[in-house]
Regions:
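Surface loop/turn motifs at the tips and blade-to-blade linkers of beta-strand repeat domains
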Residues: 35-40, 80-84, 120-125, 161-171, ...
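Beta-strand-rich domains and repeat architectures in extracellular enzymes and scaffolds
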Residues: 33-65, 80-81, 85-92
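Secretory targeting signatures
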Residues: 1-20, 177, 268-333
Length: 333
């Protein structure tokens, strides 16, 4: 009887705790704040905000450029065109320079941000897609699920991580990147090529932290198979500028739960349980155990007497079952 009372008290408590931990989804939403003009001839490859201006790289052979843009009016403040053999890709600001990747040239160009002239370059192997700077390292994508962490001074690869979802599946076609500094550590927002979504992942281990549906914004600009969502620039706090290839608009949006990360909230794969319900049930558990102990001892004594009368051959030992062991196409980014 005491055991039944004990379980009847514990069951609803643990059920409520389990529901609060696992059944309540974390919302990731893109909220449109304002819409602004964007040059629809710009095949956007990279987007970065610095000192109030948007820096944008545009791609395609013969049309690649680096430009400074007023985000509110969309007007180009200054621009530099690149050699027709260069297909520009993602960019990031590092100190007083802008680092620009190229698609297949295996060269990253370094521009002086003051006059947009090339001052140096780095070589790398494979394709270049997106890049961002997290305050310590350069983080670079190549259109697969692999992300390289690089030294900003030498461009050498320090390590490579694979971006995966909560089931361990690789997330491919990772494109333009935007690094975000949070209290939990560096985080990266990424466009997925030809997909209306932006993901948030941890660059230290590649784990997916958030998935944002941007289809409502992409639908406003669905005028070609290559005119896809591409370009994320951090404005402030949870606000970001986003646009796409040959889009006629750029959007200031709020991305929910980005600020939540900054407040130290835990999204997935948390090592500690900080649910206040766990703390609240401790006094109840102690009271229940104290109340149940006398009855449990009385039951144990009665059971031992009865067991002495049972033939030893009738003893049954529950067997534990053996544990079962857990067993890119691209046509011009």
């Amino acid at each position: 009887m005491a055991t039944l009372i004990f379980l009847s008290i514990l069951f609803p408590i643990f059920t409520a705790e389990s529901a609060s931990n696992y059944d309540t989804p974390v919302e990731y939403e893109i909220v449109l704040l304002s819409e602004h003009y964007h040059d629809n001839e710009a095949f956007t490859q990279g987007l970065e905000m610095h000192n109030g201006s948007i820096y944008e790289s545009t791609g395609l052979y013969g049309s690649s450029s680096l430009r400074e843009v007023d985000p509110w009016s969309g007007q180009v403040i200054r621009s530099v065109s690149l050699n027709e053999t260069i297909f520009s890709e993602g960019i990031t600001v590092y100190n007083d320079t802008i680092i620009m990747l190229t698609w297949k040239s295996e060269v990253a160009y370094v521009f002086d941000i003051k006059n947009l002239t090339i001052v140096s370059s780095f070589s790398y192997q494979g394709e270049g897609w997106g890049i961002c700077y997290d305050g310590k390292y350069l983080i670079m994508s190549n259109g697969t699920s692999s992300i390289s962490i690089r030294d900003p001074n030498s461009f050498n690869v320090l390590r490579v991580v694979t971006v995966t979802d909560e089931l361990g599946n690789r997330i491919n076609k990772i494109n333009e990147l935007e690094c975000v500094t949070t209290e939990e550590g560096p985080r990266v927002l990424a466009n997925i090529w030809q997909d209306d979504r932006i993901i948030l992942f941890d660059p230290s281990n590649g784990s997916l932290l958030g998935d944002f549906d941007a289809s409502s914004i992409s639908e406003k600009n669905s005028n070609g198979i290559n005119n896809v969502l591409n370009g994320i620039a951090h404005h402030n706090s949870s606000e970001f500028w986003i646009t796409g290839k040959n889009w006629s608009s750029m959007y200031l949006v709020s991305m929910t739960n980005i600020s939540g990360v900054e407040e130290g909230n835990c999204f997935t794969g948390c090592g500690q349980n900080n649910n206040p319900t766990s703390i609240a049930i401790i006094p109840v558990l102690l009271m229940t155990i104290t109340f149940s102990l006398p009855f449990l001892f009385m039951y144990r004594k009665t059971r031992d007497v009865k067991n002495q009368q049972i033939d030893e051959t009738n003893n049954r030992h529950d067997e534990l079952l053996d544990a079962v062991p857990a067993s890119q196409k691209r046509g011009g980014d």
